[in-house]
Regions:
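Short, glycine/small-hydrophobic-rich surface segments
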Residues: 61-118
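N-terminal membrane-insertion helices
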Residues: 50, 54-61
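Surface-exposed patches in mature extracellular/periplasmic domains of secreted proteins
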Residues: 68-76, 128-139, 202-212
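Structured segments of extracytoplasmic/periplasmic soluble domains
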Residues: 60-68, 101, 119, 123-127, ...
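Amphipathic alpha-helical segments typified by the pilin-like N-terminal helix
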Residues: 12-52
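N-terminal leader/signal peptides at the extreme start of proteins
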Residues: 1-15
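Secreted/periplasmic proteins that engage bacterial cell-wall peptidoglycan
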Residues: 114-163
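Short, surface-exposed interaction loops/tails
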Residues: 149-227
Length: 227
């Protein structure tokens, strides 16, 4: 007589609760170790993008100055005028003038407009900074007094990086970049590119050299040129 035999199913060998907790703990540790490095790599890449853009801005400002003879944007009558906002959407701002074509009707041909040979810059959009930040501006205004203390907000730069006091002549016309929405890590990455070796502590690095940083409002102020 034939007999039928059925093997019982083996129970699957899964993780125990203790083993699962151990695996999750290891994953959490790996994430904790890797995330800062990932963020640093991203910040480093973005900082390099902004550093490259800065060279373009410097060249544009220098060429504008060579033609027009001023760092201030020209007003409608062709007279240089300080403009503290630096928003590209403002037609009288420096970035708006740098991207203006010489054949544009905004070029009235009056006074120093006859020397204008723009565009000097292909694009500058306040709402889309290259690499770092949420918004950027390019003001053109007067510098603080020579030798006055540099702060995280004033129009002064310790370009030599030696004493925390402004090296710019009193009242000099200054073109600079203000970038909002920058983290401490992002500032450090850009500062390491632009101002490598300047400052022996965090406070000095934030206030000396071409790149200043105000951690209170996450803003960078980057010197471009002065006259």
């Amino acid at each position: 007589m034939n007999s039928f035999h059925c093997r019982p199913f083996r129970q699957s060998q899964g993780f125990t609760l203790v083993e699962m907790i151990g695996v999750l703990a290891i994953i959490a540790i790996l994430i904790a170790l890797l995330l800062p490095k990932i963020f640093t790599l991203i910040a480093s890449s973005n900082a390099r993008s902004l550093a490259a853009a800065l060279r373009t801005y410097e060249t544009a400002v220098a060429n504008y100055y060579a033609d027009v003879g001023t760092l201030y944007p020209l007003n409608v009558t062709g007279v240089p005028a300080a403009e503290n906002g630096g928003n590209s959407a403002t037609v009288t701002s420096l970035p708006a003038r740098l991207t203006l074509d010489s054949t544009d009707p905004l070029n009235t041909g009056a006074n120093q407009w006859v020397r204008f040979q723009g565009p000097y810059l292909e694009k500058f959009n306040t709402n889309t900074p290259p690499g770092l930040g949420t918004t950027m501006f390019m003001p053109a205004s007067a510098a603080i007094a020579l030798g006055a203390a540099v702060t995280g907000t004033n129009v002064g730069w310790d370009l030599k990086g030696d004493d925390g006091n402004s090296d710019l002549p009193t009242g000099a016309r200054v073109a600079y970049l203000r970038v909002d929405g920058v983290s401490d890590t992002e500032f450090s990455e850009l500062d390491g590119i632009i101002d490598a070796g300047i400052g022996t502590n965090l406070t000095e690095r934030q206030l000396r050299g071409r790149v200043k940083y105000n951690p209170g409002n996450d803003r960078m102020y980057i010197y471009l040129a002065h006259q």
